Structures are given as C-alpha cells and as structure tokens.
Amino acid sequence: MTIKSTSRRSILRGASVAAAATTMGSLMLPLSAQAAARFTISDTDFMLDGQRLQIRCGEMHFARVPREYWQHRLKAIKAMGLNTVCAYLFWNYHEWREGRYDWQGQRDAAEFCKLAQQEGLWVILRPGPYACAEWEMGGLPWWLLKKSGDAFLRTRDANFVQPARRYMKEVGRILGPQQITHGGPILMVQVENEYGFFGEDLDYMRDMKSMLQDAGFDVPLFQCNPTNAVVKSHIDGLFNVVNFGSDPQTGFKALDQVQKGPRMCGEYYSGWFDTWGAPHRRGSANGAVADIQTMLKANGSFSLYMAHGGTSFGLWGGCDRPFRPDTSSYDYDAPISEAGWTGEKFQAYRDGIKPFLPAGETLPPPPPKNPVIAIKPFAFKESCTVAAAMPIKALSVTSPQPIEQYDISRGLVSYRVTLPAGPAGKLEAAKVRDLAWVSIDGKQIGTMDTRYRRFSVDLPARSKPATLEILLYTIARVNFGVEIHDRKGLHGPVLLNGQPLENWDIRAIDFDADAVLPPLMWKTGRAQGAAFWRGGFDVTQSGDTFLDLSGWGQGIVWVNGRCLGRYWSIGPTQTMYLPGPWMKQGHNEVVVLDLTGPRSARIEGLTMPILDKLRPELDLARPPSKVKPALDGVKPAHEGEFAQGSAVQDVKFAQPLKGRQFCLESLDAFDGKQYAAVAELSLLGVDGKTLNQSNWTIVYASSEEAIKEDGGALNAINGQASDFWHTAYSGKAATAPGSKHPHRLIIDLGAEATIAGLRYTPRQGPEGVTGRIKHYRAYVGDHLVKEN
C-alpha cells in the first residue's frame, strides 16, 4: 500500500490490486471475472478500478451464526441492498489456550470470506486484537490475566503486545490471501477498535498499525471512534471512520476536522444489545433509514451494526460495565433477526437503500425462510448434582486467588474450608466474580453477587466444626473499559469475623473453549440444588426452534453435546435459539445445568422467540430498593450550568473532596421539559483522569424509563455513549411524586475516593432531544442516601 500525505487534512491512500471483479453499472462486485482492479481512498471517494464506490456495509459475526447458515445470511445481507459485509475476529475464539490456534469448522474465517465473495460482497475485516462486540473479554484471551496488574491490556506493555503480535501474524497467515490485493474480497482492515473510548497513547495505535502491516496486510488500514473521540485519536496516515447511532451530520463534521476523504460511519446502530434483567432493546427502522439516506445523499458510506446479530452460542457472551452480563441472544433488533428472518424492518431498509443504487444494479430477492418447527413439551427425568460432577482431586491453597492463577478459564468452582465451632458472625471475601452460593454442611445460607457488590454473608452459630462450601459460577468477562482486567473466582483473603480463613480445597468444572460437558453420572429423579438435568426429544424432520426455558432458573443448555449458551429466567430473553442443522433425525439429547433448581423440569420448542419478558421477582439476589436521598444540610461540591449540545463536558470543582458517594442533581433541562438524561457520567481525580468505575453501583435514581426503552440508570456508568439514563416518561412512574425536577442520580464508588471534578456526556442525538441537563448541582459525601 502506498500512502501519500500532503497535510494533516489531505491524505491519499492507494492499493494496486489484481483482483477478481466485475462491473455492474458503476459498481465493482467481487465476483469471479478475471480483471485488473485498483482500490484507493482519494480526497473525495473510495475508488475501485477508477470508479467511485459507495460502501453500503452490514456487520455479521460468523462466530455467532451456524456455519451451515453463513451463506443464507450473506444472501440476506446482499438482498437488503448492501455491497459489503463487516466481520470481527475474536482473538480468544481462535486462541483460547495460548499457542493453540483453531481456524477449522465454525472458526473458518477464510471460508467465510470466500462465501462473501461468492455472494458478490466485499469484506471489511476487524481483526482486533481487541474487539468489544459484547463478546467475552472483548475478544481478548483469558490467559493474559495470568499476568499481574490492572492496567496492561490494550497498552504497549510487553505482556500484551508480544502475544498480540504473535496472534496477528497468525491472522495474516490465514487471511492475508483473502485481501483484494491477492484476489480476495477484503477491501480494508481496521486497526484495534474504538481506542478513543479507552486510552490516549497514540503510539500504541501506531504500534497496532505496524503490527498489521508486519503481518502482511497491504490493503488500506483505518481506525474507528465515536464522534466525541475522533479528533483526539487521529494519527497521520491512518484513515478515520466515525461510529454513531444518530445525528450523522455531527459525526461527519468530526471527520472533516481531521482529514479529507470520503466520509464513512463505521458503526451505525440498527438496535442495541440486551443485558440480563433489563428491558429488551429496540431500534427505530424509520429513524435509521432516514439517517442512512442522509449519509448516502452526502456521498457518505456506512456500515450497519448489526445487519444480522445472531447468537452468542456457547459461553461467548460478554458483559457490559460495571457488571451487566449480556444475553445469549444477540438479536440486536437488527433488520435480519436472530434466526435469519427478513420482515418489515428488513423491507424498510431495503426500500430505503434501493433509490441510491448505482445505475444498472438490481437487488436479488431475499432468501427463503428456513424451516421452523415446534417441539412438544418433554420432561427431564434424570439428574446429576454439580457436587457429583466435580473432580475428586482438589487443589489445596492457603487463601483463594483468581482462578486464572490455577489455569482455570471459566465455569463452576467449588471452594471448601473447615469452619471452627463458634458464635454467629460474618463471612466476607475481598471480591467475588461472579455469583456464589454459600452453604454450611450442605445447607445454603446465602449468596454473593458481584452485580450488587455483595461479598459477605451472615453465618449462624456452630456448636462443632462444619464444612463451608462456596459454589461459584462465572458468567462472563467484561468486554469494555478498564474493567476488561476481569479476573474470575473467589478473591482472598476470605475473612470470618475479620480473621482470615485458610487451608481451602478447590475443585472446578472448566468449560473451556467449547463448553464441553464433564463426565456425568445420571440418576433417575429430581436432584436438589445445583444440578445437571437430562431429557430429550425426537424429530423426523429438523428445523429451527426456540427452546422455552421460562420454567427453569439460571444456567446453561446443551443439545447433542453442543452448547447453546446461557439462560436466566429474570429475562428479558426466555427462549434459546436452536438451529435446525444442529438437530438430528431421531433422538436429540438435551442437558440443562440449573444452579437454582427448576420450577418445572420441562421444555418445549416454540416457533417464535420470547425476547422481551422481564421477571425481576425471580432475581433472588436483587436487593430491595429502600433508600432515598439524604442531601439535607449537605453543601454542594459544585453547581453550575452545562453547555447546550451533545459535546462531552469536563467540570473542575473549586477544591477536591473525599467521599464514597456522588450525586448529580438535575435542576432543569434545556428543552424546558420535566425529564433528565445522562449518556455517561465519569468522575475526575486530582490528576484530571477519570476514576476507575469497576466497583461503582447506582444506589438511587429518581426514576428510570423502562417501558418504551431501556432508560436504566446503569446506562449512565457503562461507558457507552449511545445509550443513556432517562427519567420515566411513560406509565405510572411518569406522573408519580418525584417525576419532575429536581432529579437525582446517586452513585456508590465502592470505597472512598478523592473527587476533583466530573465529566458529563449529554444524551446524544440532534438538537431538541429530551433530557439534556441545563442547571445542576453535584454532591460528594459518605452517606448521600438513607433508609426510607
């Protein structure tokens, strides 16, 4: 690749290629005709063999789609009016154990690119090393966490860069031949991912760029960032695209500040992902189509995130910060549904894009819907307790450490220790990642839950020594922010009445890369507590179905030994997508791990998914909300007026203050309405940098919109500017006492901190969106809430 830079704002990039291409009107398609082609990025356009190419792209992750359906989904993407597919690579998917690479079967990235080319689609590759994408640890492999420290990932630290470089060379070996420069469909390759959300070391990004070039990537490279991070993350010689879910004009203006060249949205959000315990997210087709048409009219290109979301099969689903695990369904409310259906939303996108097709290009019809079947209810009559499935041999340690130190990747971990006789007291761990059930002599006495920072339980008095067991379940590693340093397990010291408990035995069921089941000894009858259950169904003809898990508690499902993913009856997802090709004629075995015990040990297969049914009453660890603000007599740390608009704003207090809790009080909004909204709220230390949010929890919010959208308060501290906390505007909560200003959002930081200021990100979108705060107050203290 040749890069000629005439100035910071004028960059010419080119790649001379001999590629498989054909001409359809003014559009070059990656088909099989032998022709010379040249792909360049000029000061105004993407150019393919001297002709303007407007990239109409849609994201699809081959890891989230059964290989048997890759071609079906690619046909649907083509039929929607797109000419390019964008694909992430997930490092941990291909190197789960250090040095062991896997590019076979479901992981065959080269075959996916070949199929895309066969369907007339170009490919934009996003190889990482970091991806995000609501994927386990953002695609980074867990074994990196064997190294100490909470600030080395995504930096120039050798403990990260050296294994990343080895991996990228392997990626180049596999996918280098799929570049357009070698006759393949890959047009461009992304460097890292949204680094502007994470860090400020531009030399790190330069190293990541060089890493790709050294691996043999010779097509144009680019970086993506959200609108508010484009300018600060720009480096010369690297093309920029911008990510947003609304307001394309502002996003494109950010690009104009750093470069000449075609404008492109690298991620336009068709919907949003779901997290356990929060409402199902939806995206407006009308709003999205209008924004896409705005971009196309402005000679812009785009990539739709997602065109087809699919499913986080296995145990690959990620976790939003500070700790909000993602559902196995990655439907995303995308125009092509989780099961590959093309309905009204798909048609709206297709109709909206069609007027912008180059002369001579026509759209193929969407592929036919795959068969869907119902499965009659079937019972589970055999079970095996988790205790019986644990290995006999234990690891003996003085005090528990994160499981990565024991070469355990994820799964179920049993910790046992002998308790002395003694009075009632408190058991407290330094940290628990993620959920744990505490028992004494086989009787459960409490739970620990990282979602609520609940790391302690009350112990009863004991007249004689007793066996304490903590059964721990890892859900997912955080995939966003500094919290990706997410080490799992029971973190010691574990204290009994302030004194360390020592001499623990540890056993684990490590589900590893593909969540393979351990050997299980089945018994007829109903097990008590955490257990595996076995049942099955017979079919004469296979087809897609949706297994209804609403009668179960929390756990994992396998069909014919293949892990479908996690389920949790709190919702919003109540079904699990089972692709037809993963069934077999005759008998199909189903194994369910349930950690809390099913209410009904039966399952049936439905012909429609259940994606939007919340059941908070089944969240056994959820603490009751019994607090209210305690601001009387508390002097504000700062009061002022935010600037109008969507830009990120830093506020410095007159003097730093110490406290464990922080309150943002909204006094009014720019639109004069009664609502408040916050896209992101960060706190600044005395060094001007944002404080670590890994231990933060929301302890109070005036209200939350939960009916028409997910306006939950946790959205204000999850690092995602595209979603937001919004006070209630529908249902009874919209007119309840406290529904008008002032509105308060109170955060517990997990420990005392010195706070020197705040960083406020308003709700994103065009002028006039509701909830942008005008006048405000900020409070710092140790006790800003009290019991009702």
What kind of feature is each model-predicted range?
Residues 72-79, 86-135, 213:
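Aromatic-lined substrate-binding rim segments of carbohydrate-active enzymes
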Residues 245-337, 341:
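Catalytic-core region of carbohydrate-active enzymes that cleave or remodel glycosidic bonds
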Residues 424-439, 468, 537-560, 567-568, ...:
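Aromatic-lined ligand-binding clefts that engage carbohydrates, nucleic acids, or primary amines
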Residues 4, 10-32:
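N-terminal export signals
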Residues 163-232:
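Active-site neighborhood of glycoside hydrolase catalytic domains
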Residues 394-398, 560, 624-660, 670-755, ...:
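Disordered, acidic Ser/Thr/Pro-rich linker "stalks" and the adjacent N-terminal cap
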Residues 35-84:
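N-terminal carbohydrate-binding accessory modules
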Residues 470-475, 592-598, 665-672:
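Short beta-strand-plus-loop segments that form exposed binding edges in beta-rich domains
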